[in-house]
Regions:
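Beta-lactam-recognizing serine transpeptidase/beta-lactamase-like catalytic domain environment
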Residues: 1-164
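Periplasmic/cell-envelope proteins involved in peptidoglycan metabolism and beta-lactam response
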Residues: 112, 167-182
Length: 182
């Protein structure tokens, strides 16, 4: 889908993988985690931008290119056909990440004069039992979580989709969000 070989390979775990790798069955919680981009899902920033583009265009996708001039793709793909109401709810939820009073990137609201839909994220570098040994104030800078955000806009007719990863940025809303909306 992009002129980089490895960008076509997305690791999406499934029950048989988990059983072989961890000797545990698949739990409903694994599905919930996958739905919000957590758990065992592995993707690159370019793949995240592709997901944002697909959501912005309500399931429609054209190939990406790193070429200097925009090349119109002849290959258009349409993913899972959600209802218009489903797409509205998805877009509304992502807009509320910034525009909502409890959104994880609500502090970005004042930084712009347009509406953006977003999903913030964090890639943990210290996990499980090791994480409990550290407080964020004592954690070495190189071990702080990576900050992520995917976004598209301006709403309601998005023209741009982005993904931003800030190494050791700690929080998607405060670490990666300002980069995405600038």
């Amino acid at each position: 889908c992009i002129d980089c070989f490895e960008e076509d390979k997305v690791f999406v775990p499934e029950p048989s993988w988990k059983m072989n790798k961890h000797n545990f069955g698949w739990f409903k919680g694994d599905t919930v985690n996958m739905g919000v981009g957590q758990g065992y899902l592995v993707s690159t920033p370019i793949q995240l931008a592709k997901y944002a583009y697909i959501m912005a265009n309500k399931g429609k996708f054209s190939d990406l290119s790193l070429k200097k001039d925009l090349v119109k793709s002849e290959k258009n793909i349409e993913f899972n056909k959600f209802s218009n109401d489903d797409w509205f709810k998805l877009h509304e939820s992502m807009v509320n990440v910034i525009e909502g009073n409890t959104g994880t990137a609500r502090r970005l609201r004042e930084r712009k004069n347009y509406i953006v839909a977003a999903k913030t994220g964090t890639a943990e570098l210290v996990s499980g039992d090791n994480r409990e040994q550290y407080s964020d104030t004592r954690l070495d800078d190189s071990l702080r979580d990576h900050a992520l955000i995917i976004a598209f806009g301006p709403m309601p007719n998005p023209r741009y989709a982005v993904s931003v990863v800030v190494e050791n940025g700690e929080s998607g809303g405060s670490g990666a969000g300002p980069v995405a909306t600038s």
